[in-house]
Amino acid sequence: MTIPAVQASGLTKLFDQKIAVDHLDLVVQEGEFFGFLGPNGAGKSTTIKMLVGLLRPTAGTALIGGVDIWTKPLAAKGMIGVLPEGQTLYERLTGREFITFAGVMYGLSEAEAAKRTEELLGLLALDDAAEKLIIDYSQGMRKKTALAAAMIHAPRVLFLDEPFEGVDAISGRAIRDVLQRLRQRGTTIFFSSHILEVVERLCTRVGVIANGRLVAEGTIPELRERAHAGEASTLEEIFLRAVGATHQDGTPEDERTLSWLA
């Protein structure tokens, strides 16, 4: 039996007795480009933080390549790269220094880390800014720098939480191109985003979370069929039905309006 790249079993998180993630079961196989969707506050970022070992679950387990992220953290974390939401970078380092530092921290030799850093700087169009301090970087440059640091060690699984948030079209295209290359080499990508067109274009399978529970999972054709949506239905239409924002006929569940715009 093939060992899944990512597996969550009964994953639960409570904050002051409020359920943020509710007994979530999820399996992502090797080489999948998995899109993880949900409304604001649905539990996406909380789930990702538990899967990568940044937030301890109240209950349940999270496995990376069959290794428990909490009982064997070094072994599990060595297999992953993480681009978290609201990433924090060392702003007094240059982009080149930060990416190289990340490579060494993941166990690469200084020479190998430096070599890979130069390749990543070129691939992500960061060459001209490589000697600038990160404190002077734009949002898009910071995202690309964080992505480079997350993938410098060629992780088995790459977790991306809102990688396109606040990113311009040029930086967005560079990031998409890199993700496509990673997918082609067999990297498993766990990808959370509110930009559904990008998810629809890139992902091989999608999961939808609402109120801390996984409410839909499958390929886009499978989700269309389960939602009784037509073949031309977009992922946005499928998503809105899955989270209960629209009725089966596509009309809004909540039709409240502003009285002064009526």
Regions inferred by a protein language model and the residue ranges of each:
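Catalytic Walker B motif of ABC-type/P-loop ATPase nucleotide-binding domains
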Residues: 158-162
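Helical segment within the ABC ATPase nucleotide-binding domain
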Residues: 173-185
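Conserved ABC transporter NBD signature motif
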Residues: 60-71, 75-76
